[in-house]
């Protein structure tokens, strides 16, 4: 049987090879003898048709109504939706990281919150967020948008929002930005884990991603007042160190202040660590986030332009890795042992730090930015623990503090070309990120305070002790007999 199969395979290969063999022989026979030298083509000569041109001409001559155009716009649009899918995967990373760094009795609750966030995030962004985020001409501070309409209307290369030319359709831009919108609430989810009331969090998350995030984002990405910063050069926040990460981080800080620490975390004898139940899950979550970040930053190029895209991928990877190395070194010195959770947060700190400036810094600059972010995150986590701000996953430090660092780093490490002038300065960058942080903090504090005095924001001590899987959902994540 094996012999028969091989014989058939050889016969089939021979049949396939015959046309190529005769084609090559014919081409060789038809080719003229080598000439001493051919005359140079005139400067204005038409370029020879390539295989793609031949294919398009063949399709056109066949009477077909549609022929794919392999052009820059098409490739850019394809890259945008791929990047959106990569950012979507980040939400699985956030959920897995949060589950791993918390107690097993709260796993179902955390997964439910993250599932709700992505669902309400995309829907609310479609109903109000997108056209609030990109309102076009407005007064620079506040403009509430309507639900999305036909985003293909007048679509094409060069069509966009707020005067921004995009190499994508309106729908492509919407789905990419919608993935960003849900991220802010996901950051808060990790910080308030294990003791927040589910209904209160759901109301808060809806208002945050549907209203607050797009309003603040419009100040920068929607043609708002931040365009006047840095001497008219605008606020530099390439992919969202401020308007996504610092926004989420300082929103989380406000919520944690009102919510309080988990029971037993801080005692008269000092700080009692509440260990996460699965470091493998936490590690998987971080590497999913690392992967998705290539879409987060790479998609923010808003096209498939090879130069910027390659630079952004490189600076993103370098900053993440030096962030991890910085966290490893510092945590080993300070804690006397290599700490995996600090290392994982070091990766994320480097990624947050480079998100503002990935397109304007050098490879060396990216490594320094990531290294400093990794050092910052260790001291920041320890600082918040010391002042009894209980953040189970380190979200405030990773996203809030390192988000601020990324914005300032854009001014410090900006590469200025020969003959060009510096565009971004510490004063303008600091003003922009403080405005974002203050807006996020005040909005979140007010909303969470209203929820606290009305429906309540914290579960009872009994429910917290039992675990929110059973208390809120009536079902544990793990059935261990």
Predicted regions mapped to residue ranges:
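Hydrophobic alpha-helical transmembrane bundles of multi-pass membrane proteins
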Residues: 5-9, 23, 27-481
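Bacterial N-terminal signal peptides
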Residues: 11-20
